[in-house]
Amino acid sequence: MDAFKLLTRATKLKGGAAPSSAQSSTRLPSTGKAANPQLFRSSEADKVLEEARHGKKRKRVAGPEAAESDDDGAELNFFGSSKARRSSASMAKEQEKEQQEQQEHRDDTSDADDADEMDEVQCRTVLNAHKIKVTDMRDLEEIQTVRVESEEPKKKKKKRKQQEESTPALTKKEQKKARRVYPQPLVSFKELRTRYKISRRLAENIAEQGFSVPTEVQLGTLPLLLEGFKVSGNSKDAESIEPDLLVVAPTGSGKTLSFLIPVINKIVRHHHEQEEERGIFSVVVAPTKELASQIVNEGRKLVHGTGVKITLMKKGMRVVDREDDDDENSHSEDSEEGSESEQDEPSTTRKKKGKAPVTKSDILVTTPLLLVNALSANRTKPMATLPLVRNIVLDEADVLLDELFRDQTLDIWRACTHPELRASLWSATMGSNIEDLAKSTIKERKQAYDRTNSYPLLRLVVGLKDSAIPNIEHKLVYAATEQGKLLGLRQLLHPAAASASDVRLRPPFLIFTQTIPRAIALHSELRYDIPAEAGGSSRIAVLHSDLSDGQRSEIMKNFRKGEIWILVTTDLLARGVDFRGINGVVNYDIPNSAAVYVHRVGRTGRAGREGGIAVTYYTKEDIPYVKSIANIIDVSEKLRGKDGEKSIQKWLLDALPDLSKKDKKELKKHGVKARQSNLKSVKDDKEHRKTRISTKSGFDRRMENKKKALIAASRNRKSKTQSTDPGSDNESWDGLDG
């Protein structure tokens, strides 16, 4: 009973009306889960999906409804004894339990067979409405030969070969149409158990996590990875083959769940079929430790009770059992035999500690360098192989196949020597060069294992490729100078009188900078901006790669718990890390590329949450580099269908200068030149002073430098005097003379 309703029964107050309107007006990502995580929807697609759901429900509900109607007549004996009524009620409950058990058994066995597949028109309607585009990346000749062979009888093959020589080449539009594929979409997460026959325990774990409506990327990828791709069309007799997959989907759309569910289900099946064979069956590669640990945390929730083990790769772990290690250990034992007896016990303990046991895990989540060092003994030996690995997953694939990680990632890929290896690449941004590299690598593997025509390579794109999510608000603010950016940031922390043009951003939020020194400087500048009553300096923290693993994990834990409100960081947290309750992102320094901007602002607005804000400050030095960001904001607003005044005006897009390819490459590698930490010339040093993050005057800074210089000089004098008087340290005080 609600106490407020009880005490206000005689009044005319309407409870709940005012709060609901207030809540709807101030809807933020931190207020909770979105009702529907999907970014793109339409009434036609919803109707098709509803028909698919209700079609199954009618079949399931038909039996219990009839039983319930029969039971109602027995329960309506109002003039019978109380014992009889109780016994009839208990009998009805027992019958209900039996019916539920029978119904669960039917759901697991017969519903998948009874469920009608969508035809190609319905599949096309659903996929187009959710802006899902699936493309076959194989050569056109290979696609056409497979389709024609499935349609034509064997007698007509000779005639077809003769006609192929005379047929004209397809236009670009016809080629795109020939490559388009319309697979069966996922209607609901319940289908994973009933139709795709995933493990019962895995299905229960998914339900416990509260997943009900699949996002666009889950709607498109899960059927392909669980059921496979029908190479010769959507006919029932067509053979389904698990494809290699390239996925480009918005940030926060559930890509981690999309690749973990099929991998876990595949390993569970393998455990049932071959109980004796154990080892690493899947490798998930991520660019940062934070993202890798997040994937492991999500995976542990899904593998609970399934018998599948998921492990985070750490320094010193052994992944394979090499014969070279045994030879080396025996050699070291022989060399230490002649040592003294006092040193025998410590040496044996050191040997035991040095050789760690081989990791017993089914799924290994790692960063590239850690696994390469483990397989090559810190680059001192040739790469060992992982012969049992059947799935390799590259999360944030565009970074892993970029110059920084490319060699390490390809070494891991080549080390997976199983002929049935499947690769899946996932990211929110993926350039054509990355796609070409992945395509060529997969093609080389197929040729090496004589499997040229065995399985397809598909690309799935959700929404517009390489664009920001449409459910957040973007603000591009000109601050002129570094001091202007600091002033704007402080206005976000301490908002004055509200106006229509002001940006209102409530904690928690992230602040991104270009370099580690700038992140440290900004943190020290903002450290005391939050009053002590609200928690003071403990509410602001800085996170970067120079910190130890323990410090980084502690900061991440406190930020997730809500003890830290504002986190200043570099691009270390720009990719993959899922902070679901973040209200906004501040780009204190502009990102190095358009792709980095997409990933930075994608830390807010996760899983369809509305109300996130992305604020980007730019100065006079940034003007040559801003156009790519302005274009992304403009496309995002068009995708959103936003009415009213746009944040990016056409005159601004026309006025901003274009950037050459050379300058783009330089910006991507080093960032804005004025903010680089390794400046050499005097002219660059003057530019660096302009971009210093500080509100101290030049006089105060000179006085501080003088003080530091005096302290350093006094320390030098003391060290010199101590070195010149060696006997003074050895003198002892004999006490007072009597």
UniProtKB/Swiss-Prot annotation:
Domain Helicase C-terminal: 488-656
Pfam family for this entry, one: DEAD
BP GO annotations: maturation of SSU-rRNA
Record motif DEAD box, residues: 395-398
Domain Helicase ATP-binding: 236-448
InterPro entries: DDX52/Rok1_DEADc, DEAD/DEAH_box_helicase_dom, DEAD_box_RNA_helicase, Helicase_ATP-bd, Helicase_C-like, P-loop_NTPase
Biased composition (Basic and acidic residues): 43-53, 93-109, 698-707
The keyword Hydrolase appears for this protein: yes
Gene Ontology CC annotations of this record: cytosol; nucleolus
EC number: 3.6.4.13
Main localization category: nucleus
UniProt feature, compositional bias: Polar residues: 20-29, 721-730
Similarity section: Belongs to the DEAD box helicase family. DDX52/ROK1 subfamily.
Domains as described in the record: The Q motif is unique to and characteristic of the DEAD box family of RNA helicases and controls ATP binding and hydrolysis.
The protein's name: ATP-dependent RNA helicase rok1
Organism from which the protein derives: Neosartorya fischeri (strain ATCC 1020 / DSM 3700 / CBS 544.65 / FGSC A1164 / JCM 1740 / NRRL 181 / WB 181)
Gene: rok1
